[in-house]
Amino acid sequence: MPLSDFVLALKDNPYFGAGFGLVGVGTALALARKGAQLGLVAFRRHYMITLEVPARDRSYAWLLSWLTRHSTRTQHLSVETTYLQHESGRISTKFEFVPSPGNHFIWYQGKWIRVERSREMQMIDLQTGTPWESVTFTALGTDRKVFFNILEEARELALQQEEGKTVMYTAVGSEWRPFGYPRRRRPLNSVVLEQGVTERIVRDIREFIDNPKWYIDRGIPYRRGYLLYGPPGCGKSSFITALAGELQHSICLLSLTDSSLSDDRLNHLLSVAPQQSLVLLEDVDAAFLSRDLAAENPIKYQGLGRLTFSGLLNALDGVASTEARIVFMTTNHIDRLDPALIRPGRVDMKEYVGHCSRWQLTQMFQRFYPGQATSLAENFADRVLQATTQISPAQVQGYFMLYKNDPAGAIQNAESLRR
């Protein structure tokens, strides 16, 4: 059969015509779909702008807070609960709603912005055990200014929430994370230490903060270490908290007794501590004892953690130690500390914070009962010291709480503090 006749036969065949038509339609649809995909990709690439913020970024928490303010109409929410136990023992909780994982749309500065909060269930943060998260902003146009404005606004909102408050950080894995909500700043004069102690520390630390060039010009490492020692309940930690508020610094809490703390992790944490922060190492005597005691009974004093004493010394002032850092250490037993730990260079200033003196008792009475005559405050101090000379500010404060509005009763029953 000639080729022309074969072609005519196929043309006249209805089954072939229908099949060819289906193939043509399918091919056209496939090409249209592929073209639409390529067109969408090209449109997103040239006419849309995207910003992805991973959960590890500092601005992630700011942006979630910002989204809570700007997505009040969203119906898909997640809850973040904060549990806080106050020093008085009272327990309070705070609930904050944030947009849940998924897509959300907000109207901002004349633009619709698509916000996608994604959660990767296959990827888990090994430090917290939570799924890996990120938030992605998508907007029409190519101007990045809208994202800068969002980040600036989120940052300002975070600063407003922290204004007048002290931010606490705790070590989680290899990074510092905020510990609860910022706490209201405690006035420095609310912690009454022995006369002159507060003034000496504040004067020294302000001189250190204000003169970085002096250290640099002389080749002296720009870091400062302080040790507060004395009986428990005398105000060491309270003073550091109040001092941080006075300096408008945050506090980084680090426990040396943490069994997961190693030499490398300690060195890394000290090197990445937030700027304008005080690093607080509480009860260092509980983490390390004098090497003389360890030599007497090595089994008894064998450490349970991975942190070594030499690792701590190197982190404080070794070759790899960081600068522009302020470290506070506290201890109830300075005699248990190795001399190498508290030598100059690692501890530049030591202050004893002990039991109440007559001056302290007088000042505390006048602070709790403003407007009362100085003679009444001195009478109270004399009666307390006649009963006992070993009384801490924490005990006195607890005693005043029993006589909130009764200074006469506080004086009359001052002898009960001996119990």
Swiss-Prot record:
Entry-annotated residues carrying Phosphotyrosine: Y181
Residues engaged in binding ATP: G230, P231, P232, G233, C234, G235, K236, S237
Mitochondrial matrix topological segments: 33-419
Molecular function terms from GO: ATP binding; ATP hydrolysis activity
Keywords: ATP-binding, Chaperone, Hydrolase, Membrane, Mitochondrion, Mitochondrion inner membrane, Nucleotide-binding, Phosphoprotein, Transmembrane, Transmembrane helix
Catalyzed reaction equations: ATP + H2O = ADP + phosphate + H(+)
Keyword Metal-binding assigned: no
Transmembrane stretches, start-end: 16-32
Function description: Chaperone necessary for the incorporation of Rieske iron-sulfur protein UQCRFS1 into the mitochondrial respiratory chain complex III. Plays an important role in the maintenance of mitochondrial tubular networks, respiratory chain assembly and formation of the LETM1 complex.
Protein name: Mitochondrial chaperone BCS1
Source organism per UniProt: Bos taurus
Protein encoded by which gene: BCS1L
